[in-house]
């Protein structure tokens, strides 16, 4: 069940508000964050068709409610308008390319089907960040119109189109849905309207209402060739064109690898109706079908069409060995756009990321994409020549990081970088990727972990354009640049600069088209050196005006300590009306051999001031999803008051944020009426989810939302809702394992029941220890207890002595099925320095298994490992951890989610008289301590004179240490 709180009551409206929350909600029986069970494509589209017949372009609130769609509807909407791309081929870093060639990433949006890409507390999620080369994104893992609005926000702010979901049709797996779909969409109009098909206008209106860019098809059935299927989509595309809906498209994938005069009419378009589809041509024998490009080009030209929306298909799993030379060896081949596909519930980029813990895994995920897009050197100025052997894409674990794509020329060798940063100041980034192990505000942790792609900042135009000083065309690598989640100023990530340079390096981050519409241009920059005392940063912000080759350098100066520091710096040389074309950083020459600097916030602004729409009175609704004695998780909806603004509401029921001067919304929290206000999230959506906010059970929680103007200074008043704590008995929160969490996060192509039944550890014994292990079981002790496949054998303690040699025997259960530890990697770890991690070089004590194949010895007869305890192992409590994870996926290391895995821990004690090694410093030791300050521009307001009135409780279920409502 759920409990809802709102501030007062709202007057009923004839048409649905833009946010689906202004109502008294019935209790929900869903124990999940999002409930998509009421969603049925035909019913949704039927609503839009009926609305159009009634003279409206979108349904009423009551009509949506009639099919069960209420609060969660806003999570599939994006109010972020797609930004225009600023093109100038003369400014592209790589010149020997077709500057108009386009890349379509037909990939999943988030890890998992259904709601994987929606806001959550899953830090180790997919934060794709190469929108700067991507024209179109496919959202392959969602049904029609169900792609997460948070991902569409991220795509649109970077100028990328994104479909709202996909329909699958496969002739070998036909459950009747293909015929039902054909019957539905090809229903003819009988009421004399302008359209031949009953639902053609509904398709367009629905996409516009939800804020996405159309529909995607996996057409491996038969209906895509029929005249009515083609005719329907031709009419849909014509309607979108006639209504001037920019970016609307229809993706079409079939098994055809090329176009011909005979198939172009149903795969792409014709001279009478124009281009109907974004056409994804199939790969052939799992490789780019370059041989078909000349014939495809001829067929397109013969039909009088353009090549703008024809893409040759590439199977992403084969990124490291495809016909890249052949696809780029003449002008005909270079005219062909490329689409990368792979695969159904997670992208291959995300699947093949590697690391020893979630933070390093996320860091290496970004580096893997940087190699794929910018080239092996992670700099578009220095790339291997285009070749057909890019280096290994899939590797076993983090020890092979340097082998991944180490000969990649990168997509930068084939496509121009893209920028949508404009048209006027201000510009701001917190280098947020859209997730974090913790949520930071001005360097201090407020809660965590979190995931929300709507909070991903505009990505850098270049990853990473490191050059010599004052020369954008000369490659340099003295300074390394990388994203990190170890620390942040605001949100969950920052960039780290490291290395050594005597002459200095420039890091050109963004190409822009930012006009200073007012005077007094200034820069805000937040950095962290990690050094005590006063130290020179040797760091400047650099700006370059349009029409100039000279950089304007704005030095940061010194830091006064090891914590985050922010400064506002005056900029001279940019007058009102002038345009900033490039923004970057400069590390000036330094004698330090280990330059280290975190950059967490960069803003370039002027005196522009724009009033923002406030929230509509009493519109904020908060739904409590989980609660313990120490934390609260909430889902929120709200609606801005756009009545005084000129908006497109009457067209499609959509109000874009830029129409009401909204850049984003801040989510605020306070514990008790007099408590300190904390920022716990940001979003561009009109809804969000914030999980695990810490607070005492006795305190009343206050959740607030305010809008932030496009001037990034003006804010609306905060609208607050008071949430009294549940008065019944709440569970204590799960005690955090200081060694970090290891659990099964995916069952791969198996089932949960089979994994629990068949994947478990049968025996772990030792010899030679002071106190040996003798763990032996005949079934999975987690069956019926936990689905996480992690077992702490607390009653089996291993005691060892410094310098002692011991032998560990490990045997997995031999299930005789494909769900078995036989098909896993198995790694073993011991903490030797007492810092509650396993990251020292000698703390990985054994690795077993083979990439993409089984290892029978894991289950029969079992593994044997002999180790010597280091003489300097720290005496005291320790831990033995053994982690199994699918051998077709990189091993996650000692912490993080496994695939079809099983993890087991044993308590340890190390004895001896030798001095123990000093505990290695971890990233948490370097974070700023203390409580986060209050958000800016609060001006003493409380806004909580009124409190929530609808505070009835429904039933509560307690499971896994959490109360779910």
Protein language model annotation of sequence segments:
Residues 632-658, 963-965:
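Conserved aromatic anchor
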Residues 731-916:
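A broad "non-catalytic interaction surface" signal
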Residues 96-121, 125-295:
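Chitinase-like catalytic core of GlcNAc-active glycosidases
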Residues 449, 495, 505-539, 567-571, ...:
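Extra-cytoplasmic beta-strand recognition segments
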Residues 712-728:
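Extracellular fibronectin type III
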Residues 692-715:
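Beta-strand-rich modules
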Residues 547-579, 592, 849-865:
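Extracellular carbohydrate recognition and processing domains
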Residues 477-506:
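Short carbohydrate-recognition loop motifs
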């Amino acid at each position: 069940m759920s409990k809802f709180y709102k501030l007062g009551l709202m007057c009923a409206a004839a048409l649905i508000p833009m946010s689906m929350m202004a109502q008294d909600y019935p209790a929900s029986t869903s124990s999940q964050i999002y409930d998509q069970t009421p969603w049925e494509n035909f019913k949704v589209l039927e609503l839009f068709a009926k609305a159009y017949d009634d003279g409206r372009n979108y349904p009423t609130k009551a009509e949506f409610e009639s099919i069960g769609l209420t609060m969660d509807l806003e999570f599939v909407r994006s109010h972020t308008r797609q930004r225009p791309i600023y093109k100038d081929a003369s400014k592209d870093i790589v010149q020997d390319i077709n500057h108009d060639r386009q890349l379509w990433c037909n990939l999943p949006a988030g890890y998992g089907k259904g709601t994987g890409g929606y806001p959550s507390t899953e830090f180790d999620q997919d934060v794709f960040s190469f929108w700067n080369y991507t024209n179109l994104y496919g959202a392959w893992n969602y049904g029609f119109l169900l792609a997460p609005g948070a991902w569409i926000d991220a795509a649109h702010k970077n100028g990328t189109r994104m479909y709202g979901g996909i329909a699958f049709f496969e002739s070998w797996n036909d459950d009747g849905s293909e015929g039902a779909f054909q019957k539905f969409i090809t229903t003819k109009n009988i009421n004399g309207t302008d359209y031949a098909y009953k639902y053609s206008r509904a398709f367009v209106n629905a996409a516009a209402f939800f804020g996405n860019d159309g529909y995607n098809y996996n057409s491996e059935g038969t209906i895509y060739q029929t005249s009515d299927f083609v005719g329907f989509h031709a009419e849909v595309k014509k309607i979108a064109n006639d209504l001037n809906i920019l970016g609307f498209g229809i993706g079409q994938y079939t098994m055809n690898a090329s176009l011909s005069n005979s198939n172009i009419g149903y795969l792409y378009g014709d001279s009478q109706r124009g281009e109907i589809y974004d056409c994804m041509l199939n790969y052939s024998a799992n490789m780019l079908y370059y041989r078909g490009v000349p014939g495809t080009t001829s067929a397109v030209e013969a039909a009088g069409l353009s090549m703008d929306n024809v893409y040759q298909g590439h199977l992403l799993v084969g990124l490291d060995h495809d016909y890249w030379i052949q696809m780029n060896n003449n002008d005909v081949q270079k005219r062909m756009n490329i689409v990368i596909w792979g695969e159904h519930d997670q992208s291959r980029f995300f699947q093949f990321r590697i690391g020893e813990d979630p933070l390093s895994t996320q860091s290496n995920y970004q580096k893997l994409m940087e190699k794929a897009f910018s080239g092996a050197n992670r700099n578009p100025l220095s790339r291997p020549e285009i070749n057909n052997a890019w280096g290994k894409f899939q590797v076993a674990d983090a020890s092979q990081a340097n082998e991944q794509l180490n000969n990649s020329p990168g997509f930068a060798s084939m496509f121009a970088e893209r920028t949508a940063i404009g048209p006027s100041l201000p510009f701001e980034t917190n280098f947020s990727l859209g997730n974090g192990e913790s949520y930071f505000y001005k360097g201090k942790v407020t809660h965590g972990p979190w995931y929300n792609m709507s909070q991903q900042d505009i990505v850098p135009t270049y990853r990473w354009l490191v050059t010599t000083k004052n020369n954008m065309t000369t490659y340099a690598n003295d300074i390394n640049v990388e994203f990190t989640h170890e620390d942040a100023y605001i949100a969950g990530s920052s960039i780290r600069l490291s290395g050594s340079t005597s002459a200095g390096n420039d890091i050109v981050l963004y190409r822009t088209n930012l006009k200073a519409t007012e005077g007094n241009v200034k820069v805000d920059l937040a950095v962290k050196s990690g050094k005590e005392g006063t130290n020179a940063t040797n760091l400047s912000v650099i700006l370059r005006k349009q029409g100039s080759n000279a950089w304007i350098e704005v030095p940061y100066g010194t830091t006064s300590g090891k914590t985050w520091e922010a400064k506002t710096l005056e900029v001279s040389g940019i007058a009102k009306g002038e345009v900033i074309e490039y923004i970057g950083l400069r590390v000036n020459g330094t004698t330090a051999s280990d330059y280290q600097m975190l950059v967490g916030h960069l803003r370039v602004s002027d005196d522009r001031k724009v009033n923002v729409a406030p929230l509509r009175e009493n519109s904020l609704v908060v739904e409590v999803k989980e609660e313990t004695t120490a934390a609260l998780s909430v889902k929120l909806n709200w609606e801005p008051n756009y009545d005084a603004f000129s908006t497109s509401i009457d067209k499609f029921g959509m109000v874009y944020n830029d129409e009401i001067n909204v850049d984003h919304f801040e989510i605020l929290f306070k514990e008790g009426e007099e408590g300190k206000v904390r920022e716990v999230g940001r979003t561009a959506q009109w809804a969000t989810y914030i999980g695990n906010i810490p607070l005492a059970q006795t305190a009343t929680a206050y959740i607030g939302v305010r809008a932030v103007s496009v001037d990034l200074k003006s804010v609306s008043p905060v609208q607050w809702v008071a949430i009294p704590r549940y008065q019944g008995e709440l569970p204590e929160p799960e005690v955090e394992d200081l060694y970090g969490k290891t659990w099964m996060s995916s069952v791969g192509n198996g089932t949960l029941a089979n994994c629990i039944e068949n994947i478990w550890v049968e025996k772990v014994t030792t010899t030679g220890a002071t106190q040996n292990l003798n763990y032996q079981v005949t079934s999975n002790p987690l069956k019926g207890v936990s689905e996480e496949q992690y077992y702490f054998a607390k009653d089996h303690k291993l005691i060892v002595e410094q310098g002692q040699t011991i032998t560990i025997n490990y045997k997995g259960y031999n299930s005789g099925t494909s769900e078995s530890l036989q098909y896993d990697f198995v790694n073993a770890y011991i903490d030797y320095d007492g810092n509650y991690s396993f990251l020292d070089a000698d703390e990985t004590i054994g690795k077993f298994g083979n990439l993409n194949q089984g290892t029978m010895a894991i289950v029969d007869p079992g593994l044997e490992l002999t180790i010597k305890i280091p003489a300097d192992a720290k005496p005291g409590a320790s831990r033995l951890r053994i982690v199994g994870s699918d051998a077709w996926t990189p091993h996650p290391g000692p912490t993080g989610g496994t695939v079809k895995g099983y993890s087991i821990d044993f308590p340890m004690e190390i004895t001896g008289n030798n001095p123990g090694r000093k505990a290695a410093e971890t990233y948490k030791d370097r974070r700023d301590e203390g409580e986060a300050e209050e958000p800016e521009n609060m001006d003493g307001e409380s806004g909580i004179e009124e409190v929530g009135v609808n505070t009835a409780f429904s039933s509560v279920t307690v499971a896994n240490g959490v109360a779910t409502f």
